[in-house]
Structures are given as structure tokens and as C-alpha cells.
Amino acid sequence: MRRLVLAAVAATLVLAPIGAQAAPRADAEVFAGLGTWIDVYDAPAYSRPGATAAKIAARGVRTVYVETANDRSTADIVKPTQLGLFVDALKDRDIRVVAWYLPGFVKPSLDVRRTRAMLSFRTPKGAAFDGVALDIESLSLKSVGLRTTRLLALSRILRSEAGETPVAAITYPSRGFERHPTWWPSFPWTEMTTLVDAWIPMTYTGTSFPGYDATYGYVARSLRLLRTAVGTDIPIHAAGGVANRMTADELKAFADAVADEGTVTGWSLYDFQTTGPKGWAALAPLGPG
């Protein structure tokens, strides 16, 4: 136990800048309204960046969330040239772009480097991302205490160095933690809320909650628990999905739960490649935001 504590302290000292304080909250408008998602496995989206951007724009999407890398990627930015062209194509259509990285918390220096890569990335036209986010879902590091320590240290670095760039936390939904209490006991909702500008819960139901009522109940409770945990002053963007694993009724249930919650400012389905006409139709009543 003593060695574990010392390791946790050492990790904090390595990762957190001395004297770093949480920066003032940035404008979270980038996370509002209709969004869609592109991950590192969506190579077809990059093959014709202009055509993909046009399709996204035709759906009224305000923000595209793009994964720059995860802890298993072979590069700090996956396919940087193609990504840059795609981001420029989106921005040419006045679509905002938020980058996200999935840290593993096993190699802190790797996570720091790849987090910083989001901030330093520039497109061929010189554009930066409009926002950045950490995808907090890896459970590879079995020590929950050390995982929490490293999450907070990484988030402090991101908050400190992001400046005016808005920062979001992408997380398992609160209901997911409630159903699986061993995943991440005592998740640091309060501490993280001081370090981010918005929360993005992955309220994915897929085939696990069949039917309208089950889907609605899971999403509604997830949003209600999250709002209780993080307070009323921080925006929430609800991400549902996976889109092609949901029926029309389940897609409607997600949208209805988001609308009924009353304080959610953004919404999306994961991901663009799997969202068909039924998915876009379900989101339509929420509007572009």
C-alpha cells in the first residue's frame, strides 16, 4: 500500500505543473447543439473530406467530434494529413471541430504528449481545433486510486495549457457507474467539474436496453444523476448510440429523454458512419441547437 501511495504521489509530481491552477472556464458554446462523431477507425470519412463534410453539413450538424488518437495508436495524431484536410473542409462549411483523445492512464508521459498534440495541431490552412476533450473510459489501470490521480493530473495540465480553448470530459454515464460500481468507485465528479467546461456522457444503450421504455429510463436516469453530481452551472452534451444498434423507437426514446431533461445543451449519436436516416430523423425534433 505504501508503495502504491508513493507511486501515486510521484505520478502527480511528474504530470502536474508546479503551482498550476484551474484556468477560468472557457466558452462552452462549441459543445452545444447537434453533433456527430468520427473516430480513428473511420478511414472512409477522410478519403473524400469535401464530400464527407458536405454530407455532415446537410444534416445541420454544428460540431464534429474527431478522435486524434488513443493510447494504443501508433502516432500522437492518427493520419494527420488526412485529418487536417478534413478539418479544413468542415470549417469551410462553418462547422466547429472538437478533438478528443482516449488516455489509458498506464503510460502518463504518453497521455500527456498526446493530449498536448491536440492543442498544437494545425491544419494545412493553419486552423486549430475549436475545442478538446478527454475520453475517460479506459479501465486498463486496475488501481482505481492511481487511475484517478493520473486523470486529475492530466486534466490539470490540459486545463492549464488549453487557454481559451474549451475543454470537455467524455465519460461513462452516471447510471453506468451505478450499475457497475467496481468500474470506477468514487469517480471525481466534483474535482473534474472545476477543470472542464462541459460534460459529455456516453449514454449508449445499443441492444442492452431494448424498447422505448428501457432506453428512455436509462438515458433519463443517467442525465439526472450526472446533473446531481456536477451541479447546474456546467453544460451537458448527451451522446447516444451506437446508432445502428438502436431501433426507431429506441432512437426516439433517447431524443425524448434529452428533451425532457430540460438542461441538456447538446446532443449527438455515435457515430457518423453508423447514423442512418432513422437516427437523423429522431434527432430532428431537438433542432440544430
Where is each model-derived feature located?
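Secretory targeting and sorting signals
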Residues: 2-22
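Boundary/entry segment of secreted carbohydrate-active catalytic domains
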Residues: 22-62, 67-69, 103, 243
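Aromatic-lined carbohydrate-recognition surfaces of secreted/lumenal glycan-active proteins
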Residues: 36-41, 96-108, 151-186, 232-245
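Short, acidic/polar
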Residues: 41-58, 108-125, 180-192, 247-259
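Active-site groove signature of glycoside hydrolases
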Residues: 62-72, 118-148, 268
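Aromatic-lined substrate-binding rim segments of carbohydrate-active enzymes
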Residues: 66-102, 142-169
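Substrate-binding surface in catalytic domains of secreted glycosidases
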Residues: 129, 133-229
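Substrate-binding cleft of secreted/luminal carbohydrate-active enzymes
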Residues: 196, 201-210, 225, 229-289
